[in-house]
Design a protein with these regions (language model features):
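Histidine-centered catalytic micro-motifs
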Residues: 4-15, 38-41
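Histidine/acidic-residue-rich catalytic or RNA/ligand-binding cores of hydrolases
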Residues: 15-19, 47-51
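Conserved beta-strand edge residues that scaffold enzyme active sites
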Residues: 42-43, 76
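Alpha-helical scaffold segments that flank or form the walls of functional sites
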Residues: 22-36, 56-62
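Glycine-rich anion/phosphate-binding loops
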Residues: 16-20, 110-113
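Hydrophobic "anchor" residues on beta-strands that sit immediately upstream
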Residues: 2-4, 35-36, 70
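Extended substrate/RNA-proximal surfaces in nucleic-acid metabolism proteins
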Residues: 48-122
Length: 122
């Protein structure tokens, strides 16, 4: 199988990864990726990026080492209502937005409640 993209990655800016953006792009290019999505955590995860980080992404090149980059966020779903920890103004500045439930900032619910939260977030 030939994998051409990875759209859910973190750099050291997320607080729990160990590579820089340039290191990630170089490694992706070496593996033959054509597209790499960098999706740092938003503020619901302790120790991660400040909103200013996302607002400044416009200065970062969208191509490095021959690989295209999409820069964005892994936005936290905070509850079963689908509340997100990023506002619309911030989200509009991103190339890519993914969302997830993380127990560090989400009160665990039933499968039905969690599913409802995911659907509401969409």
């Amino acid at each position: 199988m030939n994998i051409e993209l990875d759209m859910h990655t973190h750099t050291l800016a997320s607080g729990h990864a160990y590579s820089t953006l340039q290191e990630m792009a170089r490694a992706g290019a070496e593996k033959g990726l054509k597209l790499l999505g960098i999706t740092e955590h938003t503020s619901g995860i302790p120790g991660t990026c400040d909103p200013i980080y996302f607002r400044n992404l416009h200065v970062v090149p969208r191509r490095m080492y021959g690989i295209d980059l999409m820069l964005g966020a892994e936005i936290n779903i905070l509850d079963s209502k689908g509340t997100l920890d990023a506002d619309e103004a911030l989200m509009k500045k991103l190339d890519i937005r993914i969302a997830g439930i993380h127990l560090l900032c989400y009160e665990h619910g039933t499968v039905e409640e969690n599913t409802h939260g995911m659907i509401q977030a969409i």
